[in-house]
Amino acid sequence: MSALDNRLFAKMNGIGNEIVVVDLRDQPAPVTPADARAVAAHVPYDQLMLLQPARLPGTEAFVRIYNNDGSESGACGNGMRCVARQMFAGSDKNGLTFETRAGLLNCWRGPADGLYTVDMGEPKFGWQDIPLAEEFRDTRMIELQIGPIDAPVLHTPSVVSMGNPHAIFWVDDVNAYDLGRFGPLLENHPIFPERANITLAHIVDRQHITMRTWERGAGLTKACGSAACATAVAAARLKRTDRTVEMTLPGGQLTIEWRDNDNHVLMTGGAEFEFEGRFDPALFAGALDPTGA
């Protein structure tokens, strides 16, 4: 028996990032990686957002985040906007606080209808915090390349943690590279002991960046909120952009602000409801891991 048997779910998207939201606040039973993979086979998604009972005073829920391969993620900005939309519906609150593996996240109604803002917390730059497999004193750009030594295809990425590891490669044209081919190679590179999200980014001007991302555990996606945050921060660290930028992703636009006063990163964008349904228990009948996970 799965904790997801007969549970209501909402299929949503955050500028094209495919999200499934399930409210399990009345159900403390755990959801397994095998359950998460079974859901992905039935309702394709990039991230599965599970609202579990709150563990800390002042929070609405503990949000557990699964990628579609059954691995867990500490952060998903687009998914949190979808969660915020669901929780704000029928509520007169202007702000909500959630706990995730990456820490506390605050969400607000955005500056216009249909927009939501998520405080993604502080970025981390230390090589052990990202983490990397070896020491780099300066993570603004590290020595890493793919392709021939004398003519690398991609090289010298910036690395950042936004609760999950990110590597950003600066390019002239984000569509000129086969990210579906290079993404999994770089995601699983030995330098990233916990794997990494891989982004190709082009700085248009000081207020605008275009980007594409291969998401750790999900593959090519139309949008990755934490990658947009990491990319904006990395560009500002290199002094190539201002601290507030517009991000163009395949699925749409995000506004990212890296605040001076507290070092927190704010992400603002849309969240769309698509449909809702209920999980058939038969979906999880064979969802067993040989490890028992």
From Swiss-Prot:
Keyword Isomerase attached: yes
UniProt xrefs under SUPFAM superfamilies: Diaminopimelate epimerase-like
Domain of life, per lineage: Bacteria
Catalytic activity: (2S,6S)-2,6-diaminopimelate = meso-2,6-diaminopimelate
GO biological process entries: lysine biosynthetic process via diaminopimelate
Segment forming the signal sequence: none
EC number in record: 5.1.1.7
Enzyme class, broadest EC rank: isomerase
Pfam families noted in UniProt: DAP_epimerase (PF01678)
GO CC terms, sorted: cytosol
Pathway membership: Amino-acid biosynthesis; L-lysine biosynthesis via DAP pathway; DL-2,6-diaminopimelate from LL-2,6-diaminopimelate: step 1/1
Gene Ontology terms, MF aspect: diaminopimelate epimerase activity
TM stretches of this protein: none
Site location (Could be important to modulate the pK values of the two catalytic cysteine residues): H166, E215
Residues binding substrate: N17, Q47, N67, G77, N78, N164, N197, E215, R216, G225, S226
Main location: cytoplasm
Quaternary assembly: Homodimer.
Protein name, UniProt field: Diaminopimelate epimerase
Organism of derivation: Rhodopseudomonas palustris (strain TIE-1)
Gene label: dapF
